[in-house]
């Protein structure tokens, strides 16, 4: 049995159990389709899309691929501080049902996905603790993404305050694998085939890579952001509420450190974005990476500029090389 013939791959309907993580604001239909056409699972980070925008994006992906792809939404309740900040989740879910999305994933909780599953979608939830993974399995998901502390972007924690959960993937993944019977996909700091092989060795059936695809040709990542990623060492990120009001891992730029150093509590999610987005936009316009609020994981320095299909091909080859070097038989 080949290393990629895992329960996760079968559940997701893909050749390779590699997920392009759904990074809201950076994923495009072109990126999702290119990854899926290469045999992995492309995705749309759709949390901030209106129902009409979501429908258009799904149809754009379908114009480019017949392969499975994933749509991701945020499952947290509308925040009291800004009740109309997000598009209504129930309206977004209605689009997911109507468009018969092949794979549906969610973050920050457990929505009512019964209609989505009845429409034929494979359901994927995000966990940062064993307790969350068990709750997801009890709710009926088909697979669990185990998000380690190394991961870029918002922490997916939903059963405890995110600041209390700092479990790295090396510790989290095998515990989640032991705790649930559904396939587990490892996430957090995975950038190349070595990381994928490590995830498989921990018992995961696949790996989710986000930061690694931010520099794909098809990603909506601006030049200043791309340069910043390549220059960010492993210690060059931090988890903070300074970006949005909710814990997220981002690069330690001057703009980030200035806000952290000011010592003022961030505004509640998502009102803090009213503070950071104008600074970020100005940094992009000035082509100044030091002014960006760049969500990224601890493996950012390992990014590579390439078309998404080439990245998938390289990841597969690297995984096979890593497994071969260890003399490991994944079917054993």
Labelled PLM ranges:
Residues 154-185, 191-332:
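Conserved active-site-proximal phosphate/metal-binding subdomains
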Residues 26, 190-191:
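Residue-level detector of alpha-helix initiation sites
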Residues 1-179, 315:
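Active-site entrance/lid segments in N-terminal catalytic domains of soluble metabolic enzymes
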Residues 133, 187-188:
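Short, surface-exposed recognition loops or helix-turn segments adjacent to catalytic cores
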């Amino acid at each position: 049995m080949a290393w990629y013939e895992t329960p996760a791959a079968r559940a997701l309907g893909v050749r390779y159990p590699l997920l392009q993580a759904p990074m809201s604001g950076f994923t495009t239909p072109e990126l999702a389709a290119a990854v899926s056409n290469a045999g992995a699972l492309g995705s749309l980070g759709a949390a901030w899309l209106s129902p009409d925008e979501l429908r258009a994006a799904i149809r754009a992906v379908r114009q480019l691929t017949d392969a499975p792809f994933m749509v991701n939404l945020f499952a947290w309740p509308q925040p009291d501080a800004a009740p109309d900040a997000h598009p209504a989740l129930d309206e977004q879910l209605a689009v997911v049902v109507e468009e018969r999305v092949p794979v549906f994933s969610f973050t920050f909780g457990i929505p009512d996905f019964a209609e989505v599953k009845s429409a034929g979608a494979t359901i994927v939830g995000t966990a940062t603790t064993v307790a969350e993974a068990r709750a997801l399995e009890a709710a009926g998901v088909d697979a669990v993404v185990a998000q380690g502390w190394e991961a870029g972007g918002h922490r997916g924690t939903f059963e405890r305050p995110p600041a209390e959960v700092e479990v790295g993937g090396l510790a989290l993944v095998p515990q989640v694998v032991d705790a649930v019977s559904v396939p587990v996909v490892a996430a957090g700091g995975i950038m190349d085939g070595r990381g994928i092989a490590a995830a498989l060795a921990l018992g995961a059936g696949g790996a989710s890579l986000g930061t690694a695809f931010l520099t794909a040709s098809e990603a909506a990542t601006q030049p200043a952001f791309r340069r910043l990623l390549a220059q960010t060492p492993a210690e060059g990120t931090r988890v903070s509420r300074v970006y949005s009001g909710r814990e997220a891992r981002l690069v330690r730029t001057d703009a980030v450190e200035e806000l952290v150093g000011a010592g003022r509590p961030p505004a509640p999610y998502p009102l803090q974005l009213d503070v950071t987005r104008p600074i970020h936009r100005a940094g992009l316009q000035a082509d100044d990476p030091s002014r960006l609020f760049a969500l990224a994981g601890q493996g950012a320095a390992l990014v590579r500029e390439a078309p998404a299909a080439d990245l998938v091909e390289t990841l597969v080859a690297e995984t096979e090389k890593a497994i071969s070097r260890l003399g490991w038989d994944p079917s054993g």
